[in-house]
Amino acid sequence: MTEKQLPPWANEIPEGAFITYEPTYKTGEYFSRFHKDCFVYKTKKLLKRQEKMNYYFYDPTEHGFPKDCEYPVFVFMHGLSNSLVGDLCINYAGAEFYSKEEYQNAVGGAYLLIPIANEYRDKDGKVKGSWDESHIKPVHDLICDFAKNRAGGRISKKVIFGNSRGATMCFKMVDAYTDFFDALVPIGTADISDDATLDRYDANDIWLFYATGKRDEFNDYKTLVAPRIPRLKRMKHCFIFTPEWVYNGDHGIASINFGVEMGQHCLINPMHCNLMFDDGTPMEPTLPDGVTGWLSQMLKSCMA
């Protein structure tokens, strides 16, 4: 068995804690519940040229929920290079488990939509074509098209999730279409919207679940995140989850290394698991029902 490389923070973990090197859940178990399609749109710069954006989706009415009811749509923005792994992108974006019965029942049913960036690697191996501001309108238009043609206009609320680069895109989407979305769940980004934009969030009763680890390898908490926390705390509807350590389901502190350590950046993994350890213990005591509990509360409040 290959010996795992110790992460650079290994000597800082609490006494009695241990490190594990992969999530405890299986990937792909629910991929068959998702469909894949393609959205065609025109670019601003090349009005005569059509572009395509692939996407995955899940329809709750195919899995026991009544067809004549309205449901929210949960949009999941994947991270950098995740479009290059095929169907695994469903999992990496944090969407797969939202097709599970327990998640769907917790929120009363929800459509799931995963837009896919047209990423590729250049001759030097660098990822190009990932999410940026040029994708904001196409993603918005995809959501509108999906709501009309896939959900028959029966969409109640719109919630956008994002992981890493997708979390930055998550903020940018709501910044641009603040009166369109009802909630956002950015995971693993320091690109928090400015104060004036957060004021617009409050004016539109936007709910925000902000999640970033204090030891995120790509987003320095002390210099980039901590200065923005007081402003987030003043928002009308903001839950802040900034754990000291990111854990796997077995209570092990998470380490992931694909040439660079990123275990503490990959908060998407426990968020995908509803912030629950495998033994049913909540990772965040103030969220006894996990992320789906927060989503359920948000949806009920928005319906009131």
What are these regions (language model features)?
Residues 155-202:
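Primarily recognizes the serine-hydrolase "nucleophile elbow" in alpha/beta-hydrolase
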Residues 73, 77-137:
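Active-site machinery of serine-nucleophile hydrolases
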Residues 72, 110, 157, 207:
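Alpha/beta-hydrolase fold active-site loops
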Residues 1-72, 163, 168, 227-228, ...:
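A domain-start/cap signature at the N-terminus of enzymes
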Residues 209-218, 223, 233-304:
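C-terminal catalytic histidine-bearing segment of alpha/beta-hydrolase fold enzymes
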Residues 67-69, 84-90, 124-128, 172-173, ...:
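Short, solvent-exposed loop/turn and secondary-structure capping segments
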